[in-house]
Amino acid sequence: MTARQPDGANPKPVVLVLQDEPILAGIMRDFVEEAVCEAVVVRTAEAAVRTLEGRTDIRVVFADLDVRGSTTGLKLVAMIRDRWPPIELVLTGALAPDLDAIPARGVFCDKPFRENKVISAIRGFAA
């Protein structure tokens, strides 16, 4: 369920954060909030899909491609681009994928994070 904003209020853009490691999830959430966005944090690709199916207000997915589960990071990226084409993608991982695998309107931010790069990407896509 999406939170209702008071009449006349400008809601913050919503960013779905996918990260299975709690400490990294907290860091990623902090980056989203620093970008003046609302963070919705999930721990699995399957939970990310369920969240996207249930919400229409998500503008950006900030996802770790190394999350454990039955759906790999790049398969999730392809699914998001196919089912929710307007959603922008900020992707991360310990190892950079083949950059040709990153879809248009997507960016890869490697670890360790460069805070300014991540926040700028989120702000740019959420605007």
Where are the regions that the model predicts?
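Conserved phosphotransfer microenvironments
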Residues: D64-A78
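Short loop/helix-cap segments at secondary-structure boundaries that form the rim of catalytic
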Residues: A96-R105
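Hydrophobic/aromatic residues positioned on beta-strands within the core alpha/beta folds
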Residues: T92-G93
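Non-catalytic signal-transmission and effector/linker regions of two-component phosphorelay proteins
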Residues: M1-L16, P22-I23, D57, D82, ...
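Acidic, metal-coordinating helix/loop segments flanking the phosphotransfer/catalytic sites
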Residues: V41-V60
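Two-component/phosphorelay signaling modules centered on CheY-like receiver
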Residues: P22-V40
